[in-house]
Structure formats: C-alpha cells, structure tokens
Amino acid sequence: YYGQELNTSTYNLARMNMFLHGIAPENQKLRNGDTLDGDWPTGEETDFHMVLMNPPYSAKWSAAAGFLQDERFSDYGVLAPKSKADYAFLLHGLYHLKNNGTMAIVLPHGVLFRGAAEGKIREKLLRSGNIYAVIGLPANLFYNTSIPTCIIVLKKHRDGRDVLFIDASKKFNKGKKQNEMTDEHIDEVMELYSKRETVEKESFLASF
C-alpha cells in the first residue's frame, strides 16, 4: 500500500488506520510530503492497480509554468488553476494508474461544470474515455465540508467512452451534525454501478 499526504496529522491518521486494519508495517509505503510539488520517487513503484484519493477540495497550488512539462500534466496543454487544484490531483492519480487499473477520487461538484482550463482538461478526459462513472453524493457527508461532493471513477484505457451518472444525493440518513450513508444505501449505489444502465431517477448512461 502506497500513499502520500502533506498534512502531518492526516498522514499519521492514515498510518494508524492501516495498523487497525491489520496491514503490516513492511507493507505500508506512506510518505509525508506534497503530492503535487513532490511526485512519488521514481526509484519506487510508480503505477498501481487501484488509486483512491480524497484531496483537499479546491486547494491552492503553485501551477508554475514548469508543470506543463511534467509528465502528469503535459498531455493536456493547460494546468489546473492556482486557486483550484482539483484537476491537478485527479491527473496525478490517473498518471500513476496501471493501464488496466481503476481510480476513484472524491471532489466537489464544481469539477463537473467549471470552464476555462478545467473545461479543457475535462473534455480531453471524456474524449479519451477516462471518465467511467460519476456518483453524486449527499451534502454534509464529510467532517471537513457541508457541500455536496461526487466520486469520479476513472479508467486509463478502455473500449468506449460512455459515462455512468448515479444520483445518490438522497441516499442518506440525517444526523445531528452529519448525514450518513448506511450499508444499504451503499449497496444500492453499487448495484446501479454494476448494472451500468439507465434507471429512472437513479442513474443515466450517457454516450457521445
């Protein structure tokens, strides 16, 4: 298991989480570092069967011109804006995905419709068939934000470029401080994901 996190407290929480789930220390390859400014060392494993990301939403980053020559971003001709690093994180994860791998990243809804550089990146991802599914989540689901978020599922190489949209925004139990998705809600979403078809008021399979 490999991972990288800039915030030291979150980094230590990730290590504790792995210990609690029985992952031996020798199988933990976690780094306390900047994912965007300091990419994974090339002397270690650099592509993975599965990539999971929950980056800070709309975080600031340098977006320095030199990143246009960075292999993670160079194919897109533009960079994620300085004020919103969402697509920088997404492209970082996609770059490190194996050709037959799957990636899932949690991001704010804004990544689905914002224009300018983000729109160009999104268009290339769609035309390349990289975006496999978009799952809209309920608002107030996470501790750090009350805004609605989505899970974007990506594939590096696949036949076709259709995209499955799942509306899970109403699949939650309301709590005092946070909303909660139960195992039943998650099972319903996974069934829709597995079927990969249009279901009225639940999911839509879009092709272009």
Describe the predicted segments one by one:
Residues 1-5:
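Conserved SAM-binding motif I beta-strand of class I
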Residues 9-45:
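S-adenosyl-L-methionine
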Residues 37-38, 43-208:
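A conserved structural/catalytic subdomain of Rossmann-like adenosyl-cofactor enzymes
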